[in-house]
Amino acid sequence: RVTHFVVGVGTGGTISGTGRYLKEQNPDVQIWGIDSYGSVLKKYHETGEFDENEIYPYITEGVGEDILPENVNFDTIDHFEKVTDKDGALAARELARKEGLFLGYSCGSTFQGLRQLKDRLKPNDLVVCLFHDHGSRYVGKVYNDEWMASHGWL
């Protein structure tokens, strides 16, 4: 019944293991990985090329890599979507404010990535979006107005 699985990708274990299992149950399920700008994962998935020009500093923790982790099974992943540091942080704060979900930075990126992909979904699709971090680690960052303002995001 699950049509889409969406999760942030760092070292790749969650998306690769869960994606493999879901595709064994239903080969048509779509596995979507969320990546950060400054990471090599999306471009490598699309081209097979490790492009060092894709690498630059980013702030989001837990999503994106400047290496190709051995855990990432690129054949299992159907699509990567990149999310900016700013959009991930703002989405995490929005989920806390509107939904009462105190989630981590990477979860904000995952939610934002899903929003960016929403036009690809059909009304009867069943999307599983995995949030695998909590907000307590980000009280001094994403949930701190001064930190957000220092980056020009508030």
Task: Spell out what each predicted region is.
Residues H4, L101, Y105-F111, L117, ...:
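Terminal helix/beta-alpha structural elements that buttress the NAD(P)+-binding lobe
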Residues G19, K23, A96, K118-D119:
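N-terminal cationic-hydrophobic initiation segments that often serve targeting/anchoring roles
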Residues G8-G19, L41, S106-L114:
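Short glycine/serine/threonine-rich phosphate/pyrophosphate-binding segments
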Residues T3-V6, D78, D125:
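Conserved acidic residues
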Residues P57, Q112-L154:
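Phosphate-binding loop/pocket of nucleotide- and phosphate-handling active sites
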Residues R1-Q30:
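Glycine-rich ThDP/TPP pyrophosphate-binding loop and its adjacent helix/strand module
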Residues V7-G10, G33-D35, V128-H132:
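Short beta-strand segments
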